[in-house]
Structures are given as structure tokens and as C-alpha cells.
């Protein structure tokens, strides 16, 4: 399993709403920018895709199927993740 960070606005990305402790899975091979659950390996890297604002929520995730995960060096895309926790402390974001 791989640990990563997923940024959202109010726990939502497109039509998907995320909850702490829940798993999310699609039965397809992930494709960057098309389908799957996108995340970054570094917490601060998420700011490239989601600029900080009052609705910004940073989630620590586990990639539960890293064998099918695809990457472009900046972000990764999986077909199966689990939301571990919300990171509310800004100091954790910039480490």
C-alpha cells in the first residue's frame, strides 16, 4: 500500500463525496485525468491542483491497489483508495 494526499473542496471532487474511513473503488484501470482517484505523494504537491481557500480539505489516503496505479511524476491515479484522515494542521501541509 502507498500513502498519499488527496485535496478536495468540502470533501468533494466532481460528483464524488469522500468520508473519513471509507474505501472507494472503480472496476476499471485508472487513466490520468479521465477516471480513477487522483492523489499526490507529498501533501504540499496538492496545492498545484487545488489552490488553498476556505473550502480546501486535505485528506491522507492509502492506495489499496498500487499495481494498477498510473503516474505522470506529479500526481498518481488509482482505482482503489481508502481515506485515512483529514489533515487540518497547516504545518503538516508544508512539511
For the regions a protein language model found, what residue spans apply to each?
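Short, glycine-biased loop/turn motifs at secondary-structure junctions and
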Residues: 1-95
Amino acid at each position: 500500500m502507498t500513502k498519499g494526499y488527496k485535496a478536495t473542496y468540502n470533501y468533494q471532487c466532481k460528483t464524488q463525496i469522500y468520508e473519513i474511513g471509507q474505501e472507494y473503488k472503480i472496476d476499471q484501470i485508472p487513466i490520468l485525468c479521465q477516471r480513477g482517484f487522483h492523489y499526490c505523494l507529498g501533501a504540499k504537491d496538492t496545492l498545484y491542483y487545488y489552490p488553498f481557500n476556505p473550502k480546501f480539505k486535505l485528506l491522507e489516503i492509502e492506495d489499496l491497489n498500487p499495481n494498477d496505479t498510473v503516474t505522470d511524476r506529479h500526481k498518481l491515479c488509482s482505482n482503489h483508495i481508502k481515506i485515512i484522515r483529514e489533515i487540518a494542521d497547516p504545518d503538516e501541509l508544508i512539511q
